[in-house]
Every structure is written in structure tokens, then in C-alpha cells.
């Protein structure tokens, strides 16, 4: 399914004329009025191409290619003047965000009672999904408000990445997982906003689980302490502080700290570790009011991906800072996601996907500016961004990053379309490899159950028929099931030693070397360590 607008526009003091060129003649026009909150279609046509033009209102067009096995569900927002063309054998549904009027443009017969000989019922959008789309679809750019967003890639309806299942009887909750691109400010974001409470009130990702991240945050604490002259009496606030992994090294230097963490279990862990932590969301006034001291430094590591209310978070950060304070964030780098095709970093917790270009546009709208940018080797490629008021000196790194991004094409839609095609190629290649291994009678065990594992395994359709179980170092995940594909997760224990598999599929691929080095006995016994990126 695709949409287009008219062209060859003529404008004078009477108004405007927009012309549409259709690929075939029209012999029927259907005038269709639809009320806000209702659904139409939920069907597919075996032979007839469908076309309609929206006259007024707005609706979400939902479609799925039935010719392609395991094709994902995709959405796009339709606004007045848009023509949508739905090809044969494509299931489609219309979910109306407003009272709307559209015209069906038909070439052929049109006599049928709701579902006649031209249409075949297909419940693409059930009642639960209707409500989800009406309540949580994000039609406008979170950064600039533009509603003309373009789909980059749809990974279908998938479960929440870190909401592991307790047992086989627990049902999966599925939500649309689709990344859109804003041509105006070059922000990338998810089309659907799952309520924050569903994802962050209890959280199983613990930053201190791996030595890699403990070292990263310890090194970052040393760097920022020296860079900003932090000392005893200085005060640092960390937004989304997890278990206090960044603040603890600062505490040991005699620096006063305060974490803000929405997950109750992680707040408790941090407090048990002696790190003062407020359990709440930083964008909420009730949380902000508990911070009684002005901060020399406010940090937000990977928070800018995880929030649907970034403007308020940013304003709050500067509200609690001293006039000469500093705001430092880290985000996964969109440049690396596209260049390295690390699409498994796309999941519901990550509302936003950032480049320096898009972050710069975001902060400029708040009368702030990026003063420096550094590369960070975490999560498959990240950036550390220093943000200040307009009077701060700007390091050459800012323009250097933006120039590199423009050269790569982060400001061009075709770059994102090319990424989408590469994602499809990765899926096809990986499924062939898994099939060859299983056809040869090889056993496969997963290693690591990060959020990215939920994305890639559900998108590929790889379940417990292919992967026997997943080994996980984080004890909070032991005994649970990866959602959707329902692969059991367990501790390492002695199970690998007793019956080592032929292949260990490292799902936490950003820790591949670390995991392999710490399991040399399995390498010596003939286990082959692989990733879905091989």
C-alpha cells in the first residue's frame, strides 16, 4: 500500500487547485462518512486495486501484504488530500482518529453487501488493537510536531522487550513496532507509544550486570569529575539511574548524588547499595519537588530514547541546575543503527532514535545548544552529548558530526528506505542459516536475553523449535520466558558443561567477545559461537 498527494497546484486569491493523476480510469465513486473511533475495511481484495482520497478528517491506514509470508503489519497516517492505493492481496483497515469523509475511487463493479465478491474478511485490527491505536498512536513528531512522517521499517506486532513471561499460561501483549522518520527535523521515533507504566514501573535490565558497563560508568564518572571540577560538596543528579551504577563511583569521591529511577525494584537495589534514589519519573512535578539542592551536573544515560516527554525532562533538568551547571546525555547513535543495520535496537522502550542533527534541532527549539559531542562504544555505538544555554562555546565536534551525518544521508528519506531493504535482507539470510543448522541436526542455545533479542527473534519468527533455551547472567530473568517466541531463560549453572550445544547464538551481540572469552571451556569442547549478524 502507498499514498501520494496531488501536484501541479494553481493558487490565486480565490484559493487553490490541486491535480491528481490516477493510473487507471474511474467508473464508480463512493462517498463515505465515518465517525471518530470507528473502523472500516478489515478485509482484502483478491484482484482489485483499491483507491480512495481523504476529503476531511484523519485516519490510520493499517495494512499487511498477504503475498509475503510473515509480513509485518504497517501503519501510515492519512490526512486531507492524501490518496491511498491498496494493491490486491493486501489486507487493510481504516481506524478513524476524527470524523472523516473520503471518496472511494473504483474501476470495476461495486455491488456487494459489505463483504461481497470483491472483498474477503480479514481481522487485521481487532477491538483491542482499535483501542490501542486510538489511544496511543503518535501521529506527530515528538520533536517538531510535523505530522507528515514516513515509515522507515515495521517489525510487526511484538511484545514488550523486557516484560518477560512468568509461565506458559501468561498471555503476550502485542503492540505495533514501527519506526518513522520526520523529514522536517530528521528525528526518528516509534509510531506507537506504549504507556510508560507498562514498561518501567518494574524493570529487569540491571546496568551493573556486566563488567563492561560497570567500567564504562566508572570511567565516565572519572571523566566528568575531572572535566567539570567536581569535588566534595558538588551535587550530581542522574535521571534514569537504574541501580546507581554511575552514581556510586561519584559517591566514593565524596560527591553528593541523587538518582531518579521509575522502576521500584531498581530504586530498591540502589538504596540497598547506599545510593540515594527517588522512585519516580523525572518529568513529574511530584518527583522534581523532592530534589532540594541545585545540581552542578545532571546526567541522562539512554533516557532520551526511553521517554515520550523529552521537552519536560529537559526543562526540568535546567530548572534544578545551577546557572553554571552542566547537562550531559548519552544516546544510542542512529548513524550506527543505519550503517550497521542494528535494527534490533528498535523496541517499544525506545520511543526515539537520535542523531546529532536531530538532537541539535530539538535543543535549538528550547533555546539551548549542543556544546560538544563524543563517540561512546556502548550499545553498538552511542554518543555523549553536552548541552548548555546559548552562551556556551561550541566545540568543532558538533559541526563535524552533523557534516558526517549529512554526507551519510541522515537528512534524506532514501537512506532510511535503503536501511529498510537491508533489514529484509538480514532476515532472509539469518533464517537460511538457522534452517541449515537445524536441517543438519545441530542444536542451538541462545546466550543473553537483552531487549534486542525480543525484537529480532519475534521479527524473524525464531522460537523454541529452533533455540532450545537461553542462558542469562542476570538472575532476575532466570525461570522466565522470552515473550512472543516463548523460549525459556535460565542461569548458566552447569547445564552447558553437562550437555554443550553445537552452537551458541549470542543474542547480546554487543558483548560477543566478552561472552566468548568467559566461556573458553565451551569453545575448547567444540561449541561454535555465532550471532544473527554472521
What name fits each language-model region?
Residues 163, 329-352, 356-359, 363:
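Short, glycine-/aromatic-enriched active-site segment of Class I SAM-dependent methyltransferases
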Residues 95-133:
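Double-stranded beta-helix
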Residues 379-422:
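Flexible, glycine-/basic-rich loop-and-beta segments that form/coincide
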Residues 324-332, 528-531:
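Conserved beta-strand signature within the Rossmann-like core of class I S-adenosyl-L-methionine
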Residues 311-326:
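A short glycine-rich, Lys/Arg-flanked "PGG" loop and its adjoining helix->strand segment in the class I
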Residues 66-87:
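Short acidic-glycine-tyrosine-enriched beta hairpin
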Residues 1-27, 41, 132, 136:
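A short, N-terminal "cap"/entry segment at the start of jelly-roll beta-barrel domains
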